[in-house]
Amino acid sequence: MRHRGRRSTQHTHVREGIYIKKLIKQINPACRIQVKSVQILTSLIRDTTISIMNEAFHLVQLSNKRTLSARDVQTSVRLCTVGEISRHAVSEGVKRVTNFNSAKQYPPQPPPAKTATPSSPSSIPAPPISHPPIIPHSYLKTKVKQMNYNYRISNSSMHYLSAVIEYLLSEILELSSNGAVSAKRTLIQPRDIFLAIANDIELHSMYGHVIIPGGGTKPLFNSLSF
C-alpha cells in the first residue's frame, strides 16, 4: 500500500549516466541515448574499471609498494586492453597526467590590477590548454577506495584512469551513434551498442563475452545467396 505524501527512495539515475550523456553531446549532439543503453554502458565501464584496478593493485603488491601510481595503472591498462585501443588509451592517459602535472607546476595566476601599467609578457610558460575531464578523478578515487585495498592512491593514477575510461566510452559511443544514424535514428539503443562491439575486432575481444540485454544477435549473411 502506498502512503500519501511519501516519495520513492529508489534512485534511477547514477553518476555515470550523467557523464555518458555529456560524452554523447561532445561526440554527436544530434543523438540521444536510451535509459537502458546508459545502464548497459555503466555496467560495462564498471566491470572494466574493476578489472584494471585489480590488476594494478596486484602489480603494487608484487613490487612491495604502498602507493598506487600512474605507472601501475598504465601497465594494467596495457594488460587489460588490446591493439590500437591499448595504444590510444595509454596515449590519452599520459596526456591527462601531463596536463595534471603542468597545472600543479603553473597554477593559474590572478588577473592583473586595473591600475597596473602594461608590462612585457611573462617569461613563465603557460600550461597547455586542454578540455576539462568529463569524469572527475575524485569520483573514481572514491569508488576505487570502496574496493577495500589497503594501499594509498595517488591523484595522478586516478587522472590516468579517468582518461582511459573516457576514451573507452567515447569509442563505444561513437560507433553506436554511427550505427543509429545509419539506421535513420537519433536514439542510441542497446542493439546499436551490441553491433558496435560485435563489428569491431578489438572491442569484441574485450567485451565479446558480455551479454547485452536487448542487443539481439549478430546478423549472418550467406554469400551464396548473392
Curated annotation (Swiss-Prot):
Entry GO terms, CC: nucleosome
Region (Disordered): 100-130
GO molecular-function terms, A-Z: DNA binding; protein heterodimerization activity; structural constituent of chromatin
Signal peptide: none
Pfam families in alphabetical order: Histone
UniProt biased composition (Low complexity): 114-123
Family, as annotated: Belongs to the histone H2B family.
Protein name: Histone H2B.v1
Source organism of the structure: Dictyostelium discoideum (Social amoeba)
